[in-house]
Amino acid sequence: MALLQTSLIWAVYAIVVAVLVMVASVFIYTYQTPRDRSSVVTFTCIVAITSLLATVLLLPVDVALTSSTTSSKLGQRKPWATQDEVDKIVSLLTAVYYLLYSLDAFLCLLAIPFVYFWYEEYDEVAVESGEQSAAKRLWTAFKYTISFIAIVVVLFIVGFLVPVANIKDSKVSDYLRKLLAENRGERVLTFTLGLLITMGLFLYILYTSTGLAVLPMRMIRAAPSVSDMTWKASTSAQLESNRERQRQLEGRCRGDPGLLSSKERRELDTLVRDERTLIRRQRLAEEADGEGQSRFMRAWLKTTAFFRPLKLLGGIAILLITLMIWISMLLTAIDKAKNSICKQRCGYILSGIGVFNPINWIFVQSAKVFPIDYAVLTVVVLLLFGSSVVGISTIGIRFLWIRIFHVRKGHTSPQALLLTTAMLMLTILALDYSIPMLVAPQYATFGPQTFCDRPQGQQSDCLTNKHLIKPCSELTDNTAAKRVCTPSVTSMFLNRVTISYPFFGTVFFWSQFIFLVIYLLVLVTSFIRHPKLDERLLDQEAEEAEEERLLTSSARGVGDTYQSVGGRNNFSTRAG
């Protein structure tokens, strides 16, 4: 029975990973530009995003496997769950986490930088002339990546040398003391994980909080589209006015612009440029209405218009979910600030839940029937991931106030895509702390596990005394709880980071308040401000689409000419 249950849990995880591959693929193919696609860049981005999401979504497997050793109705371990069996489960999960965290660090710190430099080194002219070989390109990319290798080496050295905290507080339980990184290998991984989460928190605070507020508001109060009748009428009126003014100026000079004054010539040049822009806008509006489109596209446009009310309902549902997440995080943060056993000395670790947390309660109850909790957590994680993507596309990739790259659907360059993937990886690592430690701390630590709170020597289960069944907690001194309760490996990893290096724990904790404040400010701003159509961005996209259309038509023309010339040559050869 135990083997069957364990196999089913891992089978569900395999299905979820397959879904994550599809999610990552859809994201990458949706955002990358069709003109500059690179299979290596695409593959790297998909693997990196899948790996990080798989790490976060290993949590329900962790909780399900550790909770499968106990009976929550009786508050005792199941007959098969000997300490050896429990240790095997914990060891397997620990090995999987080590593998995933190591893979995540490798992809983020080495693989993505290498692929970025490898793509940057590509020179089409040099390749065609034979000046740039594949080996030379790889070597140049490796030379640039050496700086990142040096960073990894420094991290390893610092992780080896930095001493862990010396916890002397008598209130700290033996369980937490045992979490202190004991060997050098654990110290390196613990320190590196803490540093990467800290880096990710800055992105999480800026992008995820913004996206979490903007996403539902975009669905509820969508900006006017190019198919909007008012916008179309305004564009047509502007185009007609523009052409009328051009006719006046051309009539004044009788077809010879040299007769116009310098001011009028500048005005005419501006009118010609504006006319091209207005024609592009008019073409976009016609395409949005299905004119000149295939039957499939016209059917798709009608379907999306029909289901537009569902978008409004979806936006309201997402808004309610995000507000519930915000409230749950705020309640847990206040609970940590008030009831943490050793405050900043151990990174604000919370050993027991003192405040009701709605999201945590939903997870604990759903965990009793696996995989309901898995489905709920997957929705929450993908919502936060999607919010991070929306935040990055809204703000863009910036250095201070300078925008380096735009991230837009169908217009994201491979370099921007790699940087976005690296940012998302760090953001997801920050989520890997926030979800278990603030959104659902009890669920992420013990799940639905309970113990029978009876004095030692009495009956070990509470079959006849249901009121003595209590949820597992690190704070309890009952030996039965220590014998029955098994904390998740996720909670052990994260608590080890915060208790071994309290500085990280303090940064993790206070950054959550900044996240909550920024979310609230952006949400209020989104409520007040009415969304507008970004005509500048629209013109840029229309210009890029026109350039791509011209390039495609010219390439097709060259191909037809080549075929016709080849056909004539073949005919001449046969005739000869």
Curated annotation (Swiss-Prot):
The lineage of its organism: Eukaryota, Fungi, Dikarya, Ascomycota, Pezizomycotina. It comes from Aspergillus niger (strain ATCC MYA-4892 / CBS 513.88 / FGSC A1513). InterPro entries: LMBD1_LysCbl_Transport (IPR050854), LMBR1-like_membr_prot (IPR006876). GO terms for biological process: protein localization to vacuole. The keyword Membrane applies. Keywords: Cobalamin, Cobalt, Glycoprotein, Lysosome, Membrane, Transmembrane, Transmembrane helix, Transport. Glycans are attached at residue 570. It is found in: Lysosome membrane. It is a multi-pass membrane protein. The chain crosses the membrane at residues 8-28, 40-60, 98-118, 145-165, 188-208, 312-332, 347-367, 377-397, 419-439, 503-523. Residues 549-576 are annotated as: Disordered. Residues 561-576 have a biased composition (Polar residues). It comes from the Eukaryota. Belongs to the LIMR family. LMBRD1 subfamily. One of its GO terms (molecular function) is cobalamin binding. The keyword Transferase does not apply. This is Probable lysosomal cobalamin transporter.
